[in-house]
Each structure stands twice: as structure tokens, then as C-alpha cells.
Amino acid sequence: MTSESSTPTGSTRALPASITRSSSSTLSTRPSASTPASTGSLTPSTSTASLVVSPPPARSPVVSTRATATTRPRLAAERPGSATTPCPCGDTDKQLAPCLQEGAGFVIRNAAVRLYMRFGRVWFWHCMLGLWGVGNLIW
């Protein structure tokens, strides 16, 4: 079965019967006896699987030893290379004075620091810790 429909240009064309009317193409379904009626909420789970609690994994003695070991910063004498790198400044105020008077050193938290410029970067020597550091020069 076909019916005619007009197009925007006024011509008519044949349409298949299944789309002539939207009400005739919509099928109604009846709930079957095996399909439960929907209430809009989730149905309780009917799984037969049982919950088994597994024991916690065994702790490795090596991992616990590492986790509980205390860490402290190395002293200057313990650091590699510290014996061959002399500190350009001293530990006392009198020893710090020459570093500060040269204009190349300054004090950060009561520790002398020497600055050096190389390759566009600032290198600094922390006298108290015996460490080198580097940073970018920002003007």
C-alpha cells in the first residue's frame, strides 16, 4: 500500500505505507509474564557469588627496614669530593668577612655563599654545606 505526499515544489510522490503516518508505524508492546514491570529503581542483586576476604600481603623485611631507617643529610666530610674542594669562606664571622667584602659573596641564613658566573648561569658555593648550586641569571 502506498500513499501520495506533496513536496515543497508541489509535485507528488509515492511513499511506502510504513511511514505514511507515524501512529501506524509505532508498535505497542505488552509486557510479557517473564518481563518484570519497571519501577524506575534498580533491582537488588541476585548474585550467588560469595565474598572472600584475602589476608593482607606479607611485608618484606627489606622494605620495612628502608621505610623505618632515619635519613640525615651527609656531613661535608662524608660527601664525595668534599676533601678535594676547599671551602673559599670560613665558619666564623671573621672568616666570612673577606667573602662579603669582595662583593662576590653574601649571607643566606647565616651561611656564606660565593657566586660565580659562567655560561650565562650563576653558580654558587655554599660554604657551610660544601655544596655547589646553579641557577639562571634573571635581570
Swiss-Prot record:
The keyword Iron-sulfur does not apply. Coiled coil: none annotated. Embryo. Residues 14-53, 60-74 have a biased composition (Low complexity). Residues 1-12 have a biased composition (Polar residues). This is Stress-related protein 1. Involved in drought, heat, cold, and/or salt tolerance. Residues 1-86 are annotated as: Disordered. Keywords: Phosphoprotein. It comes from the Eukaryota. The modification Phosphoserine is found at residue 60.
